[in-house]
Amino acid sequence: NNCPQDWLPMNGLCYKIFDELKAWKDAEMFCRKYKPGCHLASIHLYGESPEIAEYISDYHKGQSEVWIGLWDEKKDFSWEWTDRSCTDYLSWDKNQPDHYKNKEFCVELVSYTGYRLWNDQVCESKNAFLCQCKF
């Protein structure tokens, strides 16, 4: 585990919650600038969800939802991770994703589900965000 203090080590990567509220693209750029190879977090296994949820619940100071690195760039329900990893696991909240009013193309962890379930949201919304890095 080479993760710095207050980062969550998991499956060879390190995850950190940032409480500053940013639009989705700005959050992704922040993660990329933090260190080469960093992105908004991708989640791949059922087992990763509770660990990430618990970490966010412990460290997230605000009440906001939390951006992860999943988005629908083509706006056709073909969800992709910004780190280009395969979209092999999805954990949507009920009745999601819905592209509500055809405006929701970025994915957040939903606070009232304890950050376990996902919702598609307007990408310009300001949320806290979860970066993942290799150290």
Curated annotation (Swiss-Prot):
Subcellular location: Secreted
Gene Ontology cellular-component annotations: extracellular region
Keyword Nucleus: no
GO annotation terms (biological process): defense response to bacterium
Entries under SUPFAM superfamilies matching the protein: C-type lectin-like
Predominant location category: secreted
The keyword Protein biosynthesis is assigned to this record: no
C-type lectin domain location: 10-132
Coiled-coil regions listed in the entry: none
Sequence positions that bind Ca(2+): 96, 98, 104, 119-120
Pfam families associated with the record: Lectin_C
SMART domains noted in UniProt: CLECT
PROSITE patterns, alphabetized: C_TYPE_LECTIN_1, C_TYPE_LECTIN_2
Gene3D superfamilies from the UniProt entry: Mannose-Binding Protein A, subunit A
GO molecular function: carbohydrate binding; metal ion binding
Subunit and interaction comment: Homodimer; disulfide-linked.
Additional record remark: Negative results: does not agglutinate erythrocytes from horse, ox and mouse at doses up to 800 ug/ml. Negative results: hemagglutinin activity is not inhibited by D-fructose, D-maltose, D-mannose, and D-sucrose.
Family: Belongs to the true venom lectin family.
Main function: This lectin displays hemagglutinating activity on dog (128'000 HU/mg) and cat erythrocytes, that is inhibited by beta-galactosides (D-galactose, D-lactose, and N-acetyl-D-galactosamine) and EDTA. In addition, has been shown to hemagglutinate promastigote forms of Leishmania amazonensis. Also inhibits Gram-positive (S.aureus ATCC 25923) (MIC is 31.25 ug/ml) but not Gram-negative (E.coli ATCC 25922) bacteria. Is a calcium-dependent lectin.
Record protein name field: C-type lectin BpLec
